[in-house]
Amino acid sequence: MLVEDHRNISCGGDPFNYLKSVMKAVSIQLDQGQDAKILLLKEKFPYTRGTFEGLARTTGLVLQEVSEKENEVIVNVRKQKN
């Protein structure tokens, strides 16, 4: 499983576009059927499950789970099989 840790990033731009880039990069790195875990901070990425699901879908990923632990968000995705 690929783990992408973006908890301590300093993003001066739009966090939504940053997250979109992260999802696209994860999609490129994974083979079909592989999983990834993306670690984020809730204060920097205050999005709902629906937002994460939409971003995953547009980048060829399937959202498996979104969980919160204290101020962290853990997003689990899988690369779609064609």
Q: What are these model-predicted stretches?
A:
Residues 57-82:
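C-terminal edge-of-domain segments
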Residues 1-34:
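An N-terminal amphipathic alpha-helical segment
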Residues 10, 44-46, 81-82:
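Residues that cap or initiate secondary-structure elements
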Residues 25, 29-60:
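Amphipathic, hydrophobic secondary-structure cores in small proteins
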